[in-house]
Amino acid sequence: MSGGGKGKHVGGKGGSKIGERGQMSHSARAGLQFPVGRVRRFLKAKTQNNMRVGAKSAVYSAAVLEYLTAEVLELAGNAAKDLKVKRITPRHLQLAIRGDEELDTLIRATIAGGGVLPHINKQLLIRTKEKYPEEEEII
C-alpha cells in the first residue's frame, strides 16, 4: 500500500506547519481592496525613460483610489436611497458628484446618461401674494 497516486502528498519542504503563513498579496498586506500589483504595473508602464517605481507609491496610489471610490459610491448610494431605488445608476453618480463641491472640481468629466442637475432660476419662480402685498394694491 504505497502511495500510488490519488492521496495528498505530505512529505518534503512544502509540508503544512502551524506557524507558517501562506502567500499574501500586496493588497492584503496593506489592508486594501484595490489591487496594488495592478496599480504598480500601470505606474511602471506609464513612466517615461524607464524610471523606477517604489513599492510604497503603488500602495499609496491604490489607497487613494479606494478612498475616492468609496466616497463616490457612498454619496451615490445616498442619492439612490433618497429616490427609493436599490440600484445605483449613472444619474445617481451625477447627482452625487455634482452635489459635492470638492468632487465636482476633481471630476470634471461628462457622465454618460447622467442628465443635468435640476435648477430653476429665481426670476422664473411665481411670486406669492404674502411676500409682495404692495403689488396687490397696484392691481
Swiss-Prot record:
Subunit record text: The nucleosome is a histone octamer containing two molecules each of H2A, H2B, H3 and H4 assembled in one H3-H4 heterotetramer and two H2A-H2B heterodimers. The octamer wraps approximately 147 bp of DNA. H2A or its variant H2A.Z forms a heterodimer with H2B. Component of the SWR1 and INO80 chromatin-remodeling complexes.
Organism annotation: Schizosaccharomyces pombe (strain 972 / ATCC 24843)
Primary localisation category: nucleus
Keyword Ion transport: no
Its job: Variant histone H2A which can replace H2A in some nucleosomes. Nucleosomes wrap and compact DNA into chromatin, limiting DNA accessibility to the cellular machineries which require DNA as a template. Histones thereby play a central role in transcription regulation, DNA repair, DNA replication and chromosomal stability. DNA accessibility is regulated via a complex set of post-translational modifications of histones, also called histone code, and nucleosome remodeling.
InterPro entries: Histone-fold, Histone_H2A, Histone_H2A/H2B/H3, Histone_H2A_C, Histone_H2A_CS
Location(s) in or outside the cell: Nucleus; Chromosome
Alphabetized UniProt keyword annotations: Acetylation, Chromatin regulator, Chromosome, DNA-binding, Nucleosome core, Nucleus, Transcription, Transcription regulation
Chain residue ranges for the region called Disordered: 1-27
Assigned protein family: Belongs to the histone H2A family.
Protein name stated in the entry: Histone H2A.Z
The UniProt record lists the keyword Acetylation: yes
Modification after translation, per record: Acetylated at the N-terminus. N-terminal acetylation is essential for function.
SUPFAM superfamilies reported for this sequence: Histone-fold
Biased composition (Basic residues): 1-11
One Pfam family from the record: Histone
Any GO MF annotation of the entry: protein heterodimerization activity
